[in-house]
Amino acid sequence: MRWVKYTLFFLNNFLLLVNAQDFSVGTWRDHLPYSEFNQIVEVGNFFYAASPYSLLEFDNSNNEITKLSTVNGLSEIGISCIAANNSHQSLLIAYNSSNLDLIKNGEITNISTIFNSSIIGDKSIYSLYSHSKYIYACTGFGIVVIDIERKEIKDTYILGNNNS
C-alpha cells in the first residue's frame, strides 16, 4: 500500500512538470487551411500566395515561409484578391468585406475607407491592377484608385446608369 502512495506522488509531480503545449500562455496560433491557394504574386525577393483565409510569404533569399493571418497582423480573413506593386515593393490585399491591407517593408497598414464608406450597394472588390504608384480596384460600384506612397484612396470613379 505504501508503494502505491509513492508511485502516485511521483506520477503526479511528473505530470505537473511536463509541458502540454508547444507555445506559451498569452500567445496565439492559427489552425487555418494552408492547402488551397487562388493567387500568387512576386514582390522583390518575396512570393505571396493567397488563400481565402490567409497569406503565405515565401522569402526567396533564405527559403523561409511565414504564415500571415489575423493572428499576426492581417485585418481579416476572406481574401478576395491581392496585387503586387513592384515599383514600391508593396502588396495590397483586398478582403470580401471591401477592407484593404497594405504590406510594405514588413509593416501591415489597414486602409478601411471603402469598408467604412456609406455607399449603398455592392462594395465588393473583384480585382486589382497595379500601375506606377497606384493600384486600381475594380469594385461593385466603380473603380477606386489607391495611392501606395500615401496609403490612401486617391480617387473614385462611380460607374453606372446615373453616374456614367
Protein language model regions, located:
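Bacterial N-terminal signal peptides that target proteins for export
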Residues: 1-7
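Bacterial N-terminal signal peptides
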Residues: 7-15
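Sec/Tat signal peptide C-region and signal peptidase I cleavage site
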Residues: 16-20
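Short coil-to-beta transitions that initiate beta-strands within beta-rich domains
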Residues: 22-43, 69-87, 112-131, 156-164
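Conserved beta-propeller blade signature
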Residues: 46-49, 90-93, 134-137
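Beta-propeller domains
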Residues: 50-70
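Loop/turn residues immediately N-terminal
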Residues: 53-56, 96-100, 141-144
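Short loop/turn segments that connect beta-strands within beta-propeller blades
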Residues: 59-63, 104-107, 147-151
